[in-house]
Design a protein with these regions (language model features):
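Post-signal peptide N-terminal segment of mature Sec-exported envelope proteins
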Residues: 25-46
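Short, compact, well-ordered microdomains
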Residues: 109-153
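A cross-family detector of function-defining hotspots
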Residues: 99-109
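Bacterial signal peptide processing site
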Residues: 18-21
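Short, non-transmembrane alpha-helical segments in secretory-pathway proteins
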Residues: 64-101
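C-terminal motif of bacterial Sec signal peptides marking the signal peptidase cleavage site
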Residues: 14-16
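Positively charged n-region of N-terminal signal peptides that target proteins for export
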Residues: 1-4
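Acidic/histidine-rich, surface-exposed loop or edge segments in extracytoplasmic proteins
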Residues: 55-67
Length: 153
């Protein structure tokens, strides 16, 4: 029953997004369908030891954070990644899922070899304006700490 619900939900989302102006203008991208196994610090947090020196990593739909997990654990993996971050001076962060966007091709997708990125609004004390991070829950690549954040201890 749960599986049917997720399939119907995914169809609705994919149908709605495929007709958007942004999707029509940019077309479907691809991230190469990597499948790197992630390590857990604890049940709610990934181990993330690498710092990105690319200012676009996570901040653009062309260079999303790839946490993997798909329909079964993708949303949880997104939170596991975000739980591994702190502000640049050790501030705790807060995050809110804004929704999905930006269709792309992936062999790890649910239907028709496609997936959507999730957008999270992330904030911490001292940050002038909240930032939006783009996360891919279908493909899994080496996780990195985006510019402006630090590894949670």
């Amino acid at each position: 029953m749960k599986t049917r619900f997720f399939i119907v939900l995914a169809l609705i989302i994919l149908t709605g997004c495929s007709s958007s102006k942004q999707s029509a203008k940019k077309g479907w991208g691809t991230y190469g369908s990597p499948n790197v196994e992630q390590k857990l610090l604890n049940n709610e947090t990934f181990v993330v030891d690498v710092y990105s020196d690319d200012a676009t990593y996570g901040y653009t739909q062309e260079n999303p954070i790839m946490v993997g997990g798909g329909v079964l654990s993708g949303a949880r993996n997104e939170r596991r990644f975000l739980n591994a971050l702190m502000g640049p001076d050790g501030e705790p962060i807060t995050y809110t899922r804004l929704g999905s966007c930006c269709g792309f091709k992936t062999k790890n997708g649910l239907l028709d070899d496609g997936g959507l990125l999730d957008m999270y609004q992330v904030a911490h004390k001292g940050l002038e304006k909240e930032v939006i991070l783009y996360i891919n829950m279908y493909d899994s690549d080496t996780l990195k700490i985006p510019v402006g954040f630090k590894k949670k201890k």
